From Swiss-Prot:
GO terms for biological process: defense response to other organism; phloem loading. It comes from Arabidopsis thaliana. The gene is NHL26. This is NDR1/HIN1-like protein 26. Expressed in the vasculature of roots, rosette leaves, stems, cauline leaves and flowers. Specifically expressed in phloem. Plants over-expressing NHL26 exhibit slow growth, accumulate high levels of carbohydrates in mature leaves, have increased shoot biomass, decreased root biomass and decreased seed yield.
Amino acid sequence: MSQISITSPKHCAKKGGININNRHKKLFFTFSTFFSGLLLIIFLVWLILHPERPEFSLTEADIYSLNLTTSSTHLLNSSVQLTLFSKNPNKKVGIYYDKLLVYAAYRGQQITSEASLPPFYQSHEEINLLTAFLQGTELPVAQSFGYQISRERSTGKIIIGMKMDGKLRWKIGTWVSGAYRFNVNCLAIVAFGMNMTTPPLASLQGTRCSTTI
């Protein structure tokens, strides 16, 4: 006696659904493996190259004005020009700089308004010259500011700080990383004697800056 097996449309639908699900799983697994491998390769390249932080040095700081409006209001008018070098020490990694803001400081007090520098790209082991003319108009300062400036004048020098904040992105081949915030801090010793009345007051020597990412 022969046997006849009959498969209902319902069973066929289930079988087809299983095949479609398996195909989707295979595609998902293939793409997941591909992207995981790609990310692993990028990570390994990153570890091998290990980008070094950029180097900054303040070559000159010139003070054109640093005056309190009145001794009672403690408002400061100032103008300072800064010149610094930026170096990318990496042999195979480029750097994009974005949203650069720079200002001058004295004893932890901001003595100029922030000035923005144009974004730029720095190639392997490249050195760039950056300049910024900073000004401040009626900036509030501490009550002791005038006294501190008088003491600095009697010593013949004043220490001015330069601070820069911004974002950078690493470039390895055609791959560009996400943005990292970085900060640069520099100190400059500027001649500031009693007999020095004609601006600008120039820095005595260049200084190496500290960079944090």
